[in-house]
Amino acid sequence: MIYPTEFDVIVVGGGHAGTEAALAAARMGRSTLLLTHNIETLGQMSCNPSIGGIGKGHLVKEVDALGGAMALATDMGGIQFRTLNASKGPAVRATRAQADRVRYKAAIRHMLENQPNLWLFQQAVDDLVMQGDRVAGAITQAGITFMSRTVVLTAGTFLSGKIHIGLENYTGGRAGDPAASTLGARLRDYALPVGRLKTGTPPRIDGRSIDFSVLEMQPGDDPAPVFSFRGSRDMHPQQLPCWVTHTNLRTHEIIRSGFDRSPMFTGKIEGVGPRYCPSIEDKINRFADRDSHQIFLEPEGLDTHEIYPNGVSTSLPFDIQLAALRSMKGLENAHILRPGYAIEYDYFDPRALRHTLESRRVAGLFFAGQINGTTGYEEAAAQGLLAGLNAARAARDEEGWYPGREEAYLGVLVDDLTTLGVNEPYRMFTSRAEFRLQLREDNADLRLTETGRRLGLVGDAQWDIFCRKRDAVAAERERLKSTWVNPRLVSEEDARRVLGQPVEREYSLEELLRRPGVDYATLATLPAFGGEALSGAVAEQVEIQVKYQGYIDRQHEEVARREATEHVRIPAAFDFSAVSGLSKEVQQKLALHRPETLGQASRISGVTPAAISLLHVYLKRAGAPKSE
């Protein structure tokens, strides 16, 4: 049957990409349908029970700045919070949280069920409705047809998924869930460029079988950082520690003894795994000189004994998994609740997508998450939000939006994917961003929330919080610039206590704050400080902006220089063979990738700066337009 209501946007899949996509489209006022094979697994944390980390936390903050759900759900479900790289500069500081799986999933479910314009339906999707070269809906396994203006595919690891434990394998989307094999086969019929990747997960351990008394405890930060710009510590449930153990030479010997039954070493697995989250057998093989590897024992929640051993992802046979765990300190009597496994799945080459994440071949069809070759909840959520908002805009024939590399880690992510593609699961790092000094966690709202408001993603409550912070930061910065102190106003004793030396002439408070070793809170103890000292995120932002102003200004200048060519548009039907001086190889690569701007063209492997200069001159003569 054809469902009687037509939707603006259909989202296929209810993981981290799908939930953010559906929420984004619905916040923008579009009638949105989220199709999932199981409503009970919406927002499921399929692998590790954590959110954030280096680069990843930056993405979560950006999703939050645009009105997304992940950071807020983490504050509601987080059972340990830490700031990574706390002793380093603000550009690389990152928030990471352990999450209670049940509480996190419940928070996401609550947001979905209470979002106006959003409807849920439990059925796996087997096919898409096509009208020429445009998608027009989705067909479920029961033959129900839902019509829509746009469709967002967020199938995760479910497309033609195959699970491996030792030499045994079976179809599945993840442990306990069926694969989307029919949909995977149908998508291949549409001649979309497809490949295979793999990821893995460790065995889960019953905490009652662990001897924590001999292990090193790793507590969270106190006070705990807050993830969402809309969050607070009052949202956090009870906090728990993690624990640390290590592999040893006996562990490595056991693991090597299983190589002949490993699907990775026997060729049973064809897909490429994530470089930065290798399986334990891969680590033992690649780093044969290492005597030990650190393993973090992470609690899965407040109401369960289940423990996630971070660092032991594996597809080895179960007997090897058990013996390897029991060879480690504190795990001598470990009981495995769920075996570790690897999963192979289909992904589609993201170079076949526009920067809006819309397919170049099928109009109205958007892809987000692991289906694009990424790994990680955070990367998926960021893509989901971008795909959802652009599907919503496309449903009303509005032009798409995406941030540039200089505006957001989301911009870096989508540019890397659609320009360079992937040959292994893609993970975000701060090192991928050229302009990371201005792409910090702390200013994600100042970078993106005004845009989010303009796009219809940011509601009134969030907008009010943002405006109060933005205005308070601006007012305090202006006050620090215009408040002056001199030796008559600051005693030598106070000056040495706060500044480490006397005040020898007149200075603005901003100049004093810029000095190494002087922080805002201590400066505020000077009797001459004047106004009431601010605290929390506002004080942090004021201090960072003042101390790093010179570096940030230089980065802005670098961005401005790059702008000269970055956004020069290349016409969609441009004939690269017409540009004399370009080598055949460069012409072929440009014709294959079809970059939309000179900036995108410059990041294609093998396209030289000289080739970009030639292309720029040609486009200028032809009167190529610049993008907004």
Swiss-Prot record:
SUPFAM superfamilies: FAD/NAD(P)-binding domain. Pfam families: GIDA, GIDA_C_1st, SAM_GIDA_C. GO terms for biological process: tRNA methylation; tRNA wobble uridine modification. Its main location: cytoplasm. Keywords: Cytoplasm, FAD, Flavoprotein, NAD, tRNA processing. Disulfide bonds: none annotated. FAD binds at residues 13-18. It comes from the Bacteria. Its cofactor is FAD. It is found in: Cytoplasm. NAD(+) binds at residues 273-287. GO terms for molecular function: flavin adenine dinucleotide binding. GO terms for cellular component: cytosol. NAD-binding protein involved in the addition of a carboxymethylaminomethyl (cmnm) group at the wobble position (U34) of certain tRNAs, forming tRNA-cmnm(5)s(2)U34. Homodimer. Heterotetramer of two MnmE and two MnmG subunits. HAMAP family: MnmG_GidA. Belongs to the MnmG family. This is tRNA uridine 5-carboxymethylaminomethyl modification enzyme MnmG. It comes from Laribacter hongkongensis (strain HLHK9).
